[in-house]
Amino acid sequence: MAGPDLTAVGAAFGRAAHVLLDDPPHVLDDTLSIRLADDETLRAAQLLAPDGRLVATRDEPRARWRATFVARARLVEDLVEERLAAGVTQLVILGAGLDTFAERRTDLTPRLRIFEVDEPGTQQWKRGRLAALGVAIPDCLRFVPLDFESGESWVQAIAAAGFDPGRPAVIVSTGVTQYISVDALTTTLRQAATLVPGTTVVATFILPQALIDAEDRELRRVTEERAAARGFPWISFYTPGDILSLAVAAGFDDVRHVSQSDLNARYFAGRRDGLRSPSGEHIVVATLGGEP
């Protein structure tokens, strides 16, 4: 059975390591995601030592690395909660990987319909791991298998799985844009823009090397090389202006850029352990005009 791609395992590891290593209060509590990864998967991702211990340390470069995954996930959860209060009850996660929102946020899921879109083999593996852990699949969750290389429309795929095209949604694409072409991202945004007003897309993007803070450049180099070694080279980089222009051109009216400084001020200010997000990854939030 095919497993998840190893970059998704790394993201899950980063979220879990925050709880295991960093001081409370924790920005996000997600240890389930790393429990999904069995020992074989963790070894393949070079995250399990020969003695069976997780390869996790409190040193600053690794701490900043995991803060990236923590901040992006928390921002998404806050946005989903905010939009749910405004009546948006559909959540679509593109390239869901080891995402555990549906299993963890039981305070919100009774009011949501969640569609996880990912490769068929990844979803089959995830179902098996949830069953092995005794974790029930929530009634609100629909797995939507999609071969992203096939050219099939993810909008059509979620509609076939029960998505209501007459109601707005939150569309999440985190940790994806660096792996796909500008044309592919443009297509994704245009497809999202065919949905009804009130729909919001939240996506991460990677800055060009020249815009990275000097102290983060070595971490950036190591992270990029590790992704390439796992078979997922980074091919696309964007300035904030680039990404906002793409969203506007696709049809979004309300677009905003969430910087590393914004994330640090919102989630990491005043922490005793000094945890903070590095400068390489930023976020775009784009909403179609009109209220849900």
Enumerate the language-model features and the residues they cover:
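Conserved beta-strand signature within the Rossmann-like core of class I S-adenosyl-L-methionine
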Residues: 170, 189-210
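Rossmann-like AdoMet/SAM-dependent catalytic core
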Residues: 5-6, 214-292
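Short, catalytically relevant binding-site loops at active-site mouths
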Residues: 31, 149-150, 177-179, 207-211
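Short acidic/polar active-site loop segments enriched in Thr and Asp
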Residues: 89, 199, 253
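Rossmann-like AdoMet
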Residues: 1-92, 98-144, 151-152, 165
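A short, conserved alpha-helix within the catalytic core of class I
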Residues: 141-143, 153-156, 179-192
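A short SAM/SAH-binding and catalytic strip from SAM-dependent methyltransferases
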Residues: 158, 163-184
